């Protein structure tokens, strides 16, 4: 079968062709089984990466117009030589917490030294974030976004959750929404100390006045459904209230223990259940039978020396898996999707193909997007060049800065 894709797009004035690509990862069903549109990686089947050797891609405006073999590339006004490098879709980081101030180095140092630490965890970041100016919060956010972009991330989701007052949660979302459309209201991160004796009153705030202030600035609503945070009934009330305001649900689920989070996520057709470390067979079956994506966050397990989620179990059951950084100052202070890919392959039972698909097409599925996460005609021209001939090097050479060039919306940005 010819690897050239015929499309309704033709190379137009101002279009660009990138040629001499050693291996182009398309995530296209035309080049393997599975696709970002089906949101399924078919475990045990042919790779869905749709890999084209000696490939070319044509970009017209902000979109992919053509993909295929270099020898069959149409003429364009501009030509870029990839120099025998691999090209992949830009990473889709579908879970991060980037609007915050301060850090928690003391907590990390104590944890790595085996000492107990009781200085506040999330509450430490809440205090620092509340005290920070808008300018400081935006400067921090753009710094971490630039870090991520340099490592190949072209789409990201980020959450509030370090304000926990009406004013501070709305402020965080306003700042985030200036940089991404994928903004999540996480007023239900923890119950703040001033509501410790009356968590029901805080749930009422999260589903009432705070929701009213935050909904205009967000696409998603999230809740930390876990012992010590919000139980299943509270999480249901929060997500249902958000959905009534037009926000789509996501759930921090089953990170620290078995619980109702995953089942609730599937029941409410949440786009994603995130963490998914402690799963029953019923949880796995529910994820495999529904649209909810299991978003795995290996940076958290790495940073906390916790039990790894079992990606192999989820994939073999037919669940859709995404990989994301969970970038936050407490439990996963990394903006590097390549690092998370290496961890997933080394410690979570994923193949290099599965891990890359999950960090691109899987992330797109977790955001219910069909215009990103793959390099096929009509998709956004978001892509990363690797200083390597194959995408496998992302897992094969952990810690090496392999991303050498990044394009977003058809323009080189790094």
UniProtKB/Swiss-Prot annotation:
<dbReference type="GO" id="GO:0008270">
    <property type="term" value="F:zinc ion binding"/>
</dbReference>
<keyword id="KW-0369">Histidine metabolism</keyword>
<comment type="pathway">
    <text>Amino-acid degradation; L-histidine degradation into L-glutamate; N-formimidoyl-L-glutamate from L-histidine: step 3/3.</text>
</comment>
<feature type="binding site">
    <location>
        <position position="97"/>
    </location>
    <ligand>
        <name>Fe(3+)</name>
    </ligand>
</feature>
<dbReference type="GO" id="GO:0005737">
    <property type="term" value="C:cytoplasm"/>
</dbReference>
<dbReference type="InterPro" id="IPR032466">
    <property type="entry name" value="Metal_Hydrolase"/>
</dbReference>
<feature type="binding site">
    <location>
        <position position="328"/>
    </location>
    <ligand>
        <name>N-formimidoyl-L-glutamate</name>
    </ligand>
</feature>
<dbReference type="InterPro" id="IPR011059">
    <property type="entry name" value="Metal-dep_hydrolase_composite"/>
</dbReference>
<feature type="binding site">
    <location>
        <position position="330"/>
    </location>
    <ligand>
        <name>N-formimidoyl-L-glutamate</name>
    </ligand>
</feature>
<feature type="binding site">
    <location>
        <position position="95"/>
    </location>
    <ligand>
        <name>Zn(2+)</name>
    </ligand>
</feature>
<dbReference type="GO" id="GO:0019556">
    <property type="term" value="P:L-histidine catabolic process to glutamate and formamide"/>
</dbReference>
<feature type="binding site">
    <location>
        <position position="162"/>
    </location>
    <ligand>
        <name>N-formimidoyl-L-glutamate</name>
    </ligand>
</feature>
<feature type="binding site">
    <location>
        <position position="252"/>
    </location>
    <ligand>
        <name>Zn(2+)</name>
    </ligand>
</feature>
<dbReference type="InterPro" id="IPR006680">
    <property type="entry name" value="Amidohydro-rel"/>
</dbReference>
<keyword id="KW-0378">Hydrolase</keyword>
<dbReference type="GO" id="GO:0050480">
    <property type="term" value="F:imidazolonepropionase activity"/>
</dbReference>
<dbReference type="GO" id="GO:0005506">
    <property type="term" value="F:iron ion binding"/>
</dbReference>
<comment type="similarity">
    <text>Belongs to the metallo-dependent hydrolases superfamily. HutI family.</text>
</comment>
<feature type="binding site">
    <location>
        <position position="189"/>
    </location>
    <ligand>
        <name>4-imidazolone-5-propanoate</name>
    </ligand>
</feature>
<feature type="binding site">
    <location>
        <position position="255"/>
    </location>
    <ligand>
        <name>4-imidazolone-5-propanoate</name>
    </ligand>
</feature>
<comment type="function">
    <text>Catalyzes the hydrolytic cleavage of the carbon-nitrogen bond in imidazolone-5-propanoate to yield N-formimidoyl-L-glutamate. It is the third step in the universal histidine degradation pathway.</text>
</comment>
<keyword id="KW-0963">Cytoplasm</keyword>
<feature type="binding site">
    <location>
        <position position="95"/>
    </location>
    <ligand>
        <name>Fe(3+)</name>
    </ligand>
</feature>
<dbReference type="GO" id="GO:0019557">
    <property type="term" value="P:L-histidine catabolic process to glutamate and formate"/>
</dbReference>
<feature type="binding site">
    <location>
        <position position="326"/>
    </location>
    <ligand>
        <name>Zn(2+)</name>
    </ligand>
</feature>
<feature type="binding site">
    <location>
        <position position="104"/>
    </location>
    <ligand>
        <name>4-imidazolone-5-propanoate</name>
    </ligand>
</feature>
<feature type="binding site">
    <location>
        <position position="97"/>
    </location>
    <ligand>
        <name>Zn(2+)</name>
    </ligand>
</feature>
<feature type="binding site">
    <location>
        <position position="162"/>
    </location>
    <ligand>
        <name>4-imidazolone-5-propanoate</name>
    </ligand>
</feature>
<keyword id="KW-0408">Iron</keyword>
<protein>
    <recommendedName>
        <fullName>Imidazolonepropionase</fullName>
        <ecNumber>3.5.2.7</ecNumber>
    </recommendedName>
</protein>
<feature type="binding site">
    <location>
        <position position="331"/>
    </location>
    <ligand>
        <name>4-imidazolone-5-propanoate</name>
    </ligand>
</feature>
<keyword id="KW-0862">Zinc</keyword>
<feature type="binding site">
    <location>
        <position position="252"/>
    </location>
    <ligand>
        <name>Fe(3+)</name>
    </ligand>
</feature>
<feature type="binding site">
    <location>
        <position position="326"/>
    </location>
    <ligand>
        <name>Fe(3+)</name>
    </ligand>
</feature>
<keyword id="KW-0479">Metal-binding</keyword>
<dbReference type="InterPro" id="IPR005920">
    <property type="entry name" value="HutI"/>
</dbReference>
<dbReference type="Pfam" id="PF01979">
    <property type="entry name" value="Amidohydro_1"/>
</dbReference>
């Amino acid at each position: 079968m010819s690897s050239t894709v015929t499309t309704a797009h033709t190379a137009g004035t101002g279009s660009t062709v990138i040629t001499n690509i050693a291996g182009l990862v398309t995530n296209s069903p035309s080049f393997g089984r599975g696709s970002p549109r089906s949101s399924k990686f078919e475990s045990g089947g042919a790779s869905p990466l749709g890999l084209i050797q000696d490939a070319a891609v044509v970009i017209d405006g902000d979109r992919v117009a053509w993909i295929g073999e270099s020898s069959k590339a149409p003429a364009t006004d501009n030509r870029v030589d990839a120099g025998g490098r691999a090209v992949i879709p830009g990473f889709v980081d579908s879970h991060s917490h980037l609007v915050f101030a301060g850090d928690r180095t003391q907590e990390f140092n104590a944890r790595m030294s085996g000492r107990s630490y009781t200085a506040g965890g999330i509450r430490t970041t809440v205090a620092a974030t509340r005290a920070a100016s808008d300018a400081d919060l935006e400067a921090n956010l753009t710094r971490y976004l630039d870090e991520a972009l340099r490592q190949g991330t072209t789409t990201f989701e980020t959450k509030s959750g370090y304000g926990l007052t009406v004013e501070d949660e709305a402020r965080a979302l306003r700042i985030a929404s200036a940089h991404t459309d994928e903004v999540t209201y996480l007023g239900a991160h923890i119950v703040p100390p001033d509501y410790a004796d009356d968590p029901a009153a805080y749930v009422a705030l999260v589903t009432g006045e705070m929701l009213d202030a935050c909904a205009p600035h967000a696409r998603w609503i999230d809740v930390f459904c876990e012992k010590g945070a919000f139980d299943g009934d509270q999480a249901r009330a929060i997500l249902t209230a958000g959905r009534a305001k037009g926000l789509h649900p996501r759930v921090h689920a089953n990170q620290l223990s078995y619980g109702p989070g995953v089942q609730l996520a599937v029941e409410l057709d949440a786009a994603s259940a995130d963490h998914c470390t402690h799963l029953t067979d019923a949880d796995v079956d529910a994820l495999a039978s529904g649209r909810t994506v299991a978003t795995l966050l290996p940076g958290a397990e790495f940073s906390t020396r916790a039990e790894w989620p079992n990606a192999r179990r989820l994939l073999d059951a037919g669940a859709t898996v995404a990989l994301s950084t969970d970038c936050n100052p407490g439990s996963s202070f990394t903006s590097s999707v390549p690092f998370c890919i290496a961890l997933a392959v080394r410690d979570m039972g994923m193949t290099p193909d599965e891990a890359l698909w999950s960090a691109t097409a899987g992330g797109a599925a977790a955001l219910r997007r069909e215009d990103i996460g793959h390099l096929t005609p009509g998709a956004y021209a978001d892509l990363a060049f690797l200083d390597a001939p194959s995408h496998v090097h992302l897992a094969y050479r952990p810690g090496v800065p392999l991303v050498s060039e990044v394009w977003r919306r058809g323009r080189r940005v790094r």
